[in-house]
């Protein structure tokens, strides 16, 4: 995409957005040029809240499929567009409704906590949904005397168990991008930047090992990373998450330096959303995301509980 072509395309996207009475929501892992045309860039919790409060008739969701589903469930009266229907999620794909039903059959009084990175059919079986930003707070409020099943990310679940002191049954799912970030990627970077603060996403597979290398690490959601970096006195940060966040970190804290633990930690699903696909989505109103009401109605309760916390 040439410079003029990119700028012209961005202008067309903004024109169509006004014409369609649309809002563009983008996750922090999106390509920089997609983030730049968005009305709001944030994490799953922020995006869900923004989708709930918008007055626009059309929501163009620049993220992955479960995020667009979430927007559609929370806004059944609005049109939700996903610029590329192939923008999936390996973590959301890892768990099936049958997995949850099998656990519930063994624990009839149990509570199912579903990470937002799940399909609508799994959310419909959950008691509450969480994001990485509010999982600890939500779980800490749950009754002490009932078993809890945390699905599907085992690393986030382990972090929540550590932080709350609660015993959780964990589904063995993982995000392939975050699971691939290892201690060996971190060691040399910390040695090269001894004064840097270390920001790590709770989905990372190296959680305990990385904390051993850097005990004062900050385990944060993507939104938490942005907020922390802006307010911290440190000038350098080592960052363990998908590299799309770097664009936002540099934009919101331009006087600071950010170093990715794994420069090739790229979610190919997030990167399927391009500026051209956003343009075509708005132009042709294509790839409408719909969730059947019998599923959406049950999932909505769990999502509304999530949006209310944190």
UniProtKB/Swiss-Prot annotation:
InterPro entries documented for this protein: NadA, NadA_sf, Quinolinate_synth_type2
Pathway: Cofactor biosynthesis; NAD(+) biosynthesis; quinolinate from iminoaspartate: step 1/1
EC primary class: transferase
Family: Belongs to the quinolinate synthase family. Type 2 subfamily.
Listed name of the protein: Quinolinate synthase
Positions contributing to [4Fe-4S] cluster binding: 89, 175, 267
Keyword Mitochondrion: no
Catalytic activity, as annotated: iminosuccinate + dihydroxyacetone phosphate = quinolinate + phosphate + 2 H2O + H(+)
Domain of life (superkingdom): Bacteria
Cofactors, names only: [4Fe-4S] cluster
Physiological role: Catalyzes the condensation of iminoaspartate with dihydroxyacetone phosphate to form quinolinate.
CC per GO annotation: cytoplasm
Keywords: 4Fe-4S, Cytoplasm, Iron, Iron-sulfur, Metal-binding, Pyridine nucleotide biosynthesis, Transferase
Natural source organism: Thermus thermophilus (strain ATCC BAA-163 / DSM 7039 / HB27)
GO BP term, example: 'de novo' NAD biosynthetic process from L-aspartate
Positions bound to iminosuccinate: 27, 44, 115-117, 132, 201-203, 222
EC number annotated for this UniProt entry: 2.5.1.72
Family annotation (Pfam families): NadA
Gene Ontology molecular function: any one: metal ion binding
Note describing how the cofactor binds: Binds 1 [4Fe-4S] cluster per subunit.
Localization in the cell: Cytoplasm
Major localization listed first in the record, in broad terms: cytoplasm
């Amino acid at each position: 995409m040439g410079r003029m072509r990119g700028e012209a395309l961005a202008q067309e996207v903004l024109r169509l957005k006004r014409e369609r009475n649309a809002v563009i929501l983008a996750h922090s892992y999106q390509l920089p040029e997609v983030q730049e045309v968005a009305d709001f860039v944030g994490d799953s919790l922020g995006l869900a809240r923004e989708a709930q409060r918008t007055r626009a008739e059309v929501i163009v969701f620049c993220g992955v499929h479960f995020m667009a589903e979430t927007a559609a469930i929370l806004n059944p009266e609005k049109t939700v567009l996903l610029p590329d229907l192939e923008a999936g999620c390996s973590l959301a794909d890892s768990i099936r409704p049958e997995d949850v039903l099998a656990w519930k059959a063994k624990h009839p009084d149990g509570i199912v906590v579903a990470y937002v990175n799940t399909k609508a059919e799994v959310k419909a079986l959950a008691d509450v949904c969480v994001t990485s930003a509010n999982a600890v707070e939500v779980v800490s409020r749950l009754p002490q005397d009932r078993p809890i099943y945390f699905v599907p990310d085992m690393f986030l679940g382990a972090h929540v168990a550590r932080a709350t002191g609660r015993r959780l049954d964990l589904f063995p799912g993982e995000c392939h991008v975050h699971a691939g970030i290892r201690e060996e990627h971190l060691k040399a970077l910390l040695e090269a930047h001894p004064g840097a603060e270390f920001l790590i996403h709770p989905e990372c597979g190296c959680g305990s090992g990385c904390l051993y290398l850097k005990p004062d690490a900050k385990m944060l959601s993507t939104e938490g990373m942005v907020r922390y970096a802006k307010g911290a006195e440190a000038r350098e940060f080592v960052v363990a998450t998908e590299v799309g966040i770097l664009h936002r970190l540099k934009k919101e804290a331009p006087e600071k330096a950010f170093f990715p633990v794994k420069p090739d930690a790229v979610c190919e699903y997030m990167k399927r959303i391009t500026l051209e696909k956003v343009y075509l989505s708005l132009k042709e109103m294509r790839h409408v995301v719909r969730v059947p009401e019998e599923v959406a109605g049950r999932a909505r309760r769990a999502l509304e509980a999530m949006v209310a916390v944190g």
